[in-house]
């Protein structure tokens, strides 16, 4: 069977024939010259189009998999270098003569090769491209544009080597393709449009991250802008207007317009607005930006306004994508003074005739509501699915006007919407326009943040507004008005309801909509319940309806996948945990089934299980929300062991499903569930021990990158699994294996090693006497990182590594000192430890250091003094410092524990808009030239040479891992350090007075006073009063 016959057979209707052909191809593809043979097949003009398509798709997948090997391990599918060289020589001629149906795939193949081979293995590609572009043959010019476009795409997001690798080509070809584009725009045929499209997309890729110097030189960029404006203004061919809108959008002339709009917007937002330029960009583009916003933006805005006017008059068709770009540009013009001055005269047109129509339901929207309500939800309710839509851009423009130019626009926006609503209310039933009312309500919802802000002049009117214009629509025969009514209550639920009966009426209306016939209405009702439940009056009434509401939420979760619904369920479970406890098992079973259904559907949609970990879609996001809801429910059941055991059994198949299928996307949330089950019951059940065995296997084989997320669960196994750990050395060995794998890995981050430090510490604290064979290795790995290889500058990382060795000293001081001495680390370790005492801020840190010091001294003062030499004289100073600072740490921890124990949701608290002040924003706008020197320094630069990856995190976020954690408990909680210290001092006084004298001889007067207080006052008194001396 020939190669052509093989690809013919893959298209057969007979599954056996297809399977046989595919298996045969898998054998053939191991031949070194196979990819070249398929490429040569594509050069034949005699092969049918379907066969060519089957062959080119196969070839694209084969090149994608095997052109660049991921690792050094040889594979039968590797393409030999000599075959690659021949393939590079032949692909461009094949591409040149290929039909459109296969050309896009060949372009993708070219892109894959360029991304790995240029310029090192294909140095002649630039010259070849240049020769094609400068050819007098139109087909060769077209091929050159393809080559240039693919190369520009490869370097679109690369900055490091861009100027070196393609800078000369940009300098050589941009004047040529600009001139070519200026000629093509005057033509009407589709081939010319295709060439112009490639030119515009090449320009788009080149300016994605920077404006090349070649464009800024001699103002070439201005000539390009003129070309882009000409494309924007060019009428589409008359023949297009007879086509359906969806077909028009895919036409090549429309694509030219789309990329012209895109590039004009990109230049303005990234390089042309002076006040938004910071750092290096300000230095590079300041001069260009000043000229651009003064002399170019007015022309762009005038062109955009002209296009908008023609669209509003029905004289011009604009696609949703073009409307999106227009909305984005207008939004960017609101803040700068100069562009605001140009935009202001057109506000009535833009608000009334551009924004408002896009916010109204269209005939297509109503059809979508009826025929595909799930898709309607994703488009208009779960808006992150369609964040780049025209109506969302129009809404954002409205929001920017209301927030940044509110004194000029806000009341006008509300007046416009109010007029529409009043007209609707006054019209007889047969003349009411529900689309316009829904659009007006959507306008009001869009500016809700400004309406609800502090000192807002209209916030106090919103109850009457809702009663007049929203409440009646809960019984409207028009489904999308009922949906919008729910959404309006959601947006404005936090107003000050002076009439609580109206609040309860709103709740009842929303609750009724939870049973609505239309799915979008039920979804909006569910989402509206979330803010309503925060009102005490509603919360109390809702208690009676908890089971039925939860049941409805679960039904909805099975019908549609949106993240907001998961958030609603999570808060509902948290707020009504007591009422839901009797139904916890049933709820867990339903949530489990919904989760597994979503995951199974997602796995079925992906081409292979291997692709699953990178697949993020609506279903996986919704599944994550379900896991979060389960976690919340589990924690609400703390100490109800019987119920927790039932839930563990229910969730076990789900846990196994995720771990068995390596569903990395949900590992973090799954580990939280395991953490919750083990923490809430404070013991480890047989079911969870089975999970422990599977968890360690998963971490070892494929998931060690998730050790940080798994650490809380692993910590619980150590803390609450004492009996099993003590009787099962293999359980301890498994934990140690995980720890050492993290420490020895070269690709894990510092925060992962901090997690390993935490697990090491818990083992040594909980299993004294059972870890003798492992402790020397713990000391060696931590000491090597701390004192030899890394010497971390990160405070957090350094403290956790220090505490591994400090724990070892407490565990077995003699053994640990021996290991330190063997490596000659004793002196530097103690010096580093005592030097970093101020960083030991938590109660646990201070107790640990104190008990470790006392354990070391117990070995024999003279022996220890010789071993640590200079640090010996500081031991008493360190202990006094630890004890003096401990009361403050104890008080801080007690306060955190009090907050945690009494933690409830603030049902009567004010809303999240409290932080937004009506008077806060500067309605004068931003001066166009406000940023002259790159903006402020946000804390100084971080040197990559001296700062590790954790330092950068600390630089911006602080040492949060060293903050007190009220949920962190160890056996040291039972230690009274003040009593322990007093007993130690009595023992020294009675048995080693010389050692005592040696320890206190270097104390300052203030330190002696502190010591006197520490040994004479009651421990209970010391624990609550800090040293005043």
Curated annotation (Swiss-Prot):
GO terms for biological process: mRNA export from nucleus; protein import into nucleus. Keywords: Cytoplasm, Nucleus, Protein transport, Transport. Pfam families: Cse1 (PF08506), IBN_N (PF03810). One of its GO terms (molecular function) is nuclear export signal receptor activity. Its main location: cytoplasm. The keyword Mitochondrion does not apply. This is Probable importin c550.11.
